[in-house]
């Protein structure tokens, strides 16, 4: 499924797909597994190639770990004056494993430029008029490749679509959660300004733009059971938090792009040089090892089977 084909079909505008190619590139450097760099082939003649893996020091991940430890570590405390509120917030963060996940997603923010935190309600008790009487609060963590801004102002994202991929019975699905502002009125028709509305849809990841599931279809899938198609928050405050590095985005020709950039976005050449020289240094030891020269008649036994391991570089 091409999610940008889906957005085009639905008439949804977001950031150009080329920027998400850059996010994928940053992620590959973060994982030290860049196509056509860490994975390459060596030609041995007569049409034979050998697949090789270039060694890496993993410096992209290392600098992301370092900035993460500076931004959110065990010395950070969240202090709220009201004790009841403080206790409630601590319980929500503990349930979301924020001490661990928060630090990890600071690292992912440094790696790809942007992350998001999306609180949501579960185990809700709802009144007849649709208002929520009680519920538990949980927290979703979203990486950059699954964040699609649809409206922004002065680099502040005001409307956004979050993608949550799931696999069920070997079929891939994605929940698209669209947070957008709509006019808000009370029951008497009085204008209350704007409120955030959350629209959910589930798409089966088939070829092209995918296939939209009906609410009845997605409720049959455990991951999406009970998912509401539309939620009116009754608030003008965004029900999500976008977290990005305080670094200007200079990798996109669109200067208004509200997404962040990787900590090492402008140092790819440096990372490549480090890994190239480290790999060359390691190869010097491999190529400098002792070699044993063997007569051709000693390479096979009486039945013609090879005696030595052809992958053993000593012989």
Regions found by a protein language model. Give the residues of each.
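Short linear motifs in intrinsically disordered/low-complexity regions
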Residues: 3-6, 14-17, 28, 67-70, ...
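Extended, regular secondary-structure scaffolds
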Residues: 103-106, 116-256
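Acidic/proline-rich low-complexity IDRs
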Residues: 2, 11-14, 24, 56, ...
